[in-house]
Amino acid sequence: MEKYLSVTTLTKYLKMKFDKDPYLERVYLTGQVSNFRKRPTHQYFSLKDDHAVIQATIWSGIYQKLGFDLEEGMKINVIGRVQVYEPSGNYSIIIEKAEPDGVGALAIQFEQLKKKLTEEGLFQERFKQALPQFSKRIGVVTSRSGAVIRDIITTVSRRFPGVDILLYPTKVQGEGAAEEIARNIARANQRDDLDLLIIGRGGGSIEDLWAFNEEIVVRAIFESRLPVISSVGHETDVTLADFVADRRAATPTAAAELATPVTKLDVLAHLQNQEKRMVTAVRNVLSKKQEALKKCSQSVIFRQPERLYDGYLQRLDQLQLRLKQSLRTRISDNKQLVQARTHQLVQLSPVTKIQRYQDRLGQLDKLLGSQMALVYDAKVAEAKRLSEALLMLDTSRIVARGYAIVKKEESVVDSVESLKKKDQVTLLMRDGQVELEVKDVKTKEI
């Protein structure tokens, strides 16, 4: 009887065969990218031809080192190993290396980055800076030992002696070159005494020049405050640095010429031309002044110089007359002012003030005497009237006239309403007093 295998057993067997097959451990495969959608980490897609499809995987670390981005429909050559994925039973190729078929990976990467940066606008003319006419100090980012720096120094010294060249020794190819180029561009921009920056290197293969195609270098040039001249490779070599730089030069010598657009000979010629123009201008002015002097020497004033100051003599007489009149007026005004001030001083003199106060005091003394007499007479009359009123109120005088005063408990009784039957009262009379008891109280009818 036949023994039936489980799916798992069969899949494990197939996986074991795949893993141990020496032909599947390293497979060279060509195909067209299909079902590709770029992911942030690992990449999963298909490779196909006209008759078959195989699943493909590139781990993130491998993909980052490819140097180009996969695109849908791109034909690529890959090296990898074939494996079986047990849970699904599918087999796939794990890619360890890949490159575009027919076109180099660097060319693909160049076009992809160029497209990206073009869409961002980094290569637009509106961002290009004008190169200075006269540079005092030029920075150069290149190798210390290459011919580039020698050609630049020679050309600049010949065209305009006195311009300083500041070299930033830089690795221009190989691992880490792009980062160093970008770093030195940033360093140069930190200085305030640089007017211009030249970056470049000599010729070489696309791999040798690749550092100048790296995105970090392109962005460093774009962000440069200083105008940048790119001189990378030969005239036929084109890099992304050339697109973003403010100017491109085919050779280091051409870069130095762009950096010094005005030469020493140009300046000397300009100065000589200016000198000629100044000499001509001075001669013209001198000629005009001589002609004017000649005309002046023939004028009436020069023939009869005394007429030159006739008008001034007349003016002097007028001023003298006005001065005398002004002095007389000033003296008169001052006399009147002195008289007024003298009168004021007299009025303000202590003797005058004392006399006025004495006169006023005499007047007040007389007025006070008369007022005091009037007050005295009024007070005497008032005292007499009050005395008579007091006498009228004296009880002894009242009882002497035959009247009697009734008192109850030391209080004078002035109304029957203050009394009631059996009240004890005292009757004060002229020659004594009588103690009485009230028998009855009768109110006077009105």
Curated annotation (Swiss-Prot):
CDD domains per UniProt: ExoVII_LU_OBF (cd04489)
Pfam assignment, any one: Exonuc_VII_L
Location (main, coarse): cytoplasm
NCBIfam families in UniProt: xseA
Similarity comment text for this entry: Belongs to the XseA family.
EC numbers on record: 3.1.11.6
GO cellular component, one term: exodeoxyribonuclease VII complex
Protein name per the record: Exodeoxyribonuclease 7 large subunit
Membrane-spanning segments: none
Keyword annotations of the record: Cytoplasm, Exonuclease, Hydrolase, Nuclease
Gene (name only): xseA
Location within or outside the cell: Cytoplasm
Molecular function via GO: exodeoxyribonuclease VII activity; nucleic acid binding
Biological function: Bidirectionally degrades single-stranded DNA into large acid-insoluble oligonucleotides, which are then degraded further into small acid-soluble oligonucleotides.
Catalysed reactions listed for this entry: Exonucleolytic cleavage in either 5'- to 3'- or 3'- to 5'-direction to yield nucleoside 5'-phosphates
Subunit structure: Heterooligomer composed of large and small subunits.
GO BP annotation list: DNA catabolic process
